[in-house]
Amino acid sequence: MKSGRFIGVMSGTSLDGVDVVLATIDEHRVAQLASLSWPIPVSLKQAVLDICQGQQLTLSQFGQLDTQLGRLFADAVNALLKEQNLQARDIVAIGCHGQTVWHEPTGVAPHTLQIGDNNQIVARTGITVVGDFRRRDIALGGQGAPLVPAFHHALLAHSTERRMVLNIGGIANLSLLIPGQPVGGYDTGPGNMLMDAWIWRQAGKPYDKDAEWARAGKVILPLLQNMLSDPYFSQPAPKSTGREYFNYGWLERHLRHFPGVDPRDVQATLAELTAVTISEQVLLSGGCERLMVCGGGSRNPLLMARLAALLPGTEVTTTDAVGISGDDMEALAFAWLAWRTLAGLPGNLPSVTGASQETVLGAIFPANP
C-alpha cells in the first residue's frame, strides 16, 4: 500500500485561488505538513466564469484553457515544493481535482467536466498525478459529487456525537456523520458564489470581506422568498449542483422582479439565502450536536452568526477548532483520494452520491521512472 508524502490540488467553484496542500498519508492517519494558495490570473478566472455561464468556445480556445490551467496547477505545486525544499522524488503523487466547468449529473447523458491537463502537471513537476475523480461515479449512476464526505467521515466521525461537516465554497455541501447511519452528503445550494458574483459586479471586489457590505444592508424578504422557491432547494438527496446553475444569470432573473433595490440589501439577502438553505437542510436531516464549518464561508462572520442563530442547540464551530484547517480541507481530501486510488481502495460513498456501487476513483498519469 502506497504511503508517504502526497500533494492535493484544488481549484473550486469560488475561483478564489488554487489551494495546494502537502501531507503524509498512510492507512492510519493524514498529517498536513504545509499549504499555500496560488493566485489565478484574472484572464483565466474570467475565461472559466464565461464557460460556466454557457459562453461558447471554439475547440481551440477550449484546448488552450485546458493547457493553461494544467500549467497553472503545475506552477502552484512547484512553488510549494520550492518553499518546502523538496524534490519530485520526495512525493508519491499529486491528487488534482481540476477546474469544474460543467456539472450535469442527470439527464439522457449525465456528465461532469473538470479541466486542467494532468499531462501538463506530470511533465512540469515530474510527479505522478491522479485526476478525473468524478466521472467513474457518474458512470455508475451517481452524482459524481460530493466526494469529500468520505474524507470527513475518515477524519471527523464520532462514535456517539451527531456531527455534520459543512463546506462553504462557491457551492455549500453538507456531510452527515450520524452514529449508526450510513454517511450522507449533498450540495445544499449556493455558498459564496452568488455573494461573490454580486459584489464583483457592483464594487469590483472579489468577495465581501468580513461581510461589510452584507452587514450594511437589510434582507429583502420578498426577494429571499422568490429565490427560495427554486426547485433545487426542495429536491431530495442525492443531489449536486454548480456554477452552471447558480450563477449571475440566475440572480439576474430573480432581480428582474425587484428593480432599484439597494446593492447592499441584495448582498444581505444573498447571505441570508445561503444561511437559510443550509440550516433548513441540517434540520431536515435530523439535526446535529456539532456543525463543523470549513471553506471560505467559515471566515464570514455574518454567515457563522446566522447559522448559529438558525440552529439553536447546535454547536457551530470551524474545523480549525478540531485541528484541520478549513481553508485546506478540500485540497487535503483530494490528496487522500489520490492515496486511495493508488492503494486500490474505493473513494466514493454510494449513500452520498447515489452510485450503484463503491469504486476506485480517478485516472493515473504516471511520471517517468
Curated annotation (Swiss-Prot):
Matches recorded under CDD domains: ASKHA_NBD_ANMK
Record flagged with keyword Kinase: yes
GO MF annotation list: ATP binding; kinase activity; phosphotransferase activity, alcohol group as acceptor
Catalytic activity: 1,6-anhydro-N-acetyl-beta-muramate + ATP + H2O = N-acetyl-D-muramate 6-phosphate + ADP + H(+)
Binding site for ATP: 12-19
Pathway: Amino-sugar metabolism; 1,6-anhydro-N-acetylmuramate degradation; Cell wall biogenesis; peptidoglycan recycling
Keyword Nucleotide-binding recorded: yes
Signal peptide segment: none
Gene3D superfamilies listed in its UniProt record: 3.30.420.40
EC code: 2.7.1.170
UniProtKB keywords: ATP-binding, Carbohydrate metabolism, Kinase, Nucleotide-binding, Transferase
InterPro entries from the UniProt entry: Anhydro_N_Ac-Mur_kinase, ATPase_NBD
A Gene Ontology BP annotation from the UniProt entry: amino sugar metabolic process
Pfam family, any one: AnmK
PANTHER family per UniProt: ANHYDRO-N-ACETYLMURAMIC ACID KINASE (PTHR30605:SF0)
Family: Belongs to the anhydro-N-acetylmuramic acid kinase family.
Record function comment: Catalyzes the specific phosphorylation of 1,6-anhydro-N-acetylmuramic acid (anhMurNAc) with the simultaneous cleavage of the 1,6-anhydro ring, generating MurNAc-6-P. Is required for the utilization of anhMurNAc either imported from the medium or derived from its own cell wall murein, and thus plays a role in cell wall recycling.
Listed name of the protein: Anhydro-N-acetylmuramic acid kinase
